[in-house]
UniProtKB/Swiss-Prot annotation:
SMART domains: Aldolase_II (SM01007). The lineage of its organism: Eukaryota, Fungi, Dikarya, Ascomycota, Saccharomycotina. Zn(2+) binds at residues 133, 135, 223. Its EC number is 4.2.1.109. It comes from Meyerozyma guilliermondii (strain ATCC 6260 / CBS 566 / DSM 6381 / JCM 1539 / NBRC 10279 / NRRL Y-324). This is Methylthioribulose-1-phosphate dehydratase.
């Protein structure tokens, strides 16, 4: 059974919801996820129901609320009421779209995103404000062109400046932003192996996050990429910059060029 589509329905035909987890504010996480999913769909990052996005309500009354797009939904048709909400403390499910009126759900049974444990890892280990998972073709191609290597590397490209320079503060054991990467810096992104089920990637993702304190992303071979940032707009910028660099790297590699200047 397919998920219901309300993308073209007049608002008057959609029942009003008395839901404390939703808002008319365009900057509310549930609304932003829908907006970004449409943008990402147009970029071929979340086609065929693939990929996902989650946002932590860092500017709301409870910054531990995490909004997550459901599994198996056409991302360009996503509606705010279709969000799952999870409490970061204890990872308790607070809201499910299955609680909405049947007028909306059409008896469709929504499932939480299979990315949920991976998103939670980014929030708990990096204090992220948003996490994006795409099936970017450039990301997949890079993991193939790099063979069995466990790191993607590129340097001396102007777009690297859009990414943060991070380091581990050993006294606090926290990752801190110390500025932006520079033109001559080398970007390193860990590559982990894919698994038959998304949630089975969790341990590998956590290990990569621990071993690469300077990264804001993890590539998954033959699958895609996870990107996070301190808020949703930073995560968006990082994702766009990384996809640019990955696409460029594919072209450089196929042209026989090194992606890292010797």
């Amino acid at each position: 059974m397919s998920a219901p589509c309300h993308c073209s329905a007049p608002k008057a035909n959609i029942p009003a919801l008395d839901d404390k987890y939703l808002s008319d504010d365009p900057a509310h996480p549930a609304n932003l996820i829908c907006e970004l999913c449409r943008l990402f769909y147009d970029n071929n990052w979340v086609t065929g129901t693939g990929g996902g996005i989650s946002i932590r309500d860092v500017k709301g009354e409870n910054p531990n609320l995490v909004y997550i797009a459901p599994s198996g939904i056409q991302k360009e048709r996503l509606q705010p009421w279709e969000m799952f909400v999870v409490d970061l403390n204890g990872e308790k499910l607070l809201r499910t779209p299955n609680e909405c009126p049947q007028e909306l759900t059409k008896s469709y049974k929504y499932k939480p995103s299979a990315c949920t444990p991976l998103f939670m890892s980014c929030y708990t280990m990096r204090e992220a404000g948003a996490c994006i998972h795409t099936h970017s073709q450039s990301a997949v191609m890079c993991t193939l062109l790099w063979g069995d290597k466990v790191e993607f590397e590129i340097s001396h490209i102007e777009q690297i400046k859009a990414l943060p320079q991070l380091k581990l503060n050993e006294s606090t054991s926290k990752i801190e932003k110390v500025g932006s990467m520079q033109y001559y810096d080398k970007l390193v992104i860990p590559i982990i192996e894919n698994t038959p089920h998304e949630e089975d990637l969790t341990d590998s993702l956590q290990e990569a996050i621990r071993n690469y304190p300077g990264t804001t992303a993890v590539l998954v071979r033959r699958h895609g990429i996870y990107v996070w940032g301190e808020d949703v707009w930073k995560a968006k910028v990082y994702n766009e910059a990384l996809d640019y660099l990955l696409e460029l790297a594919v072209k450089m590699k196929t042209a026989g060029m090194d992606t890292v200047r010797k």
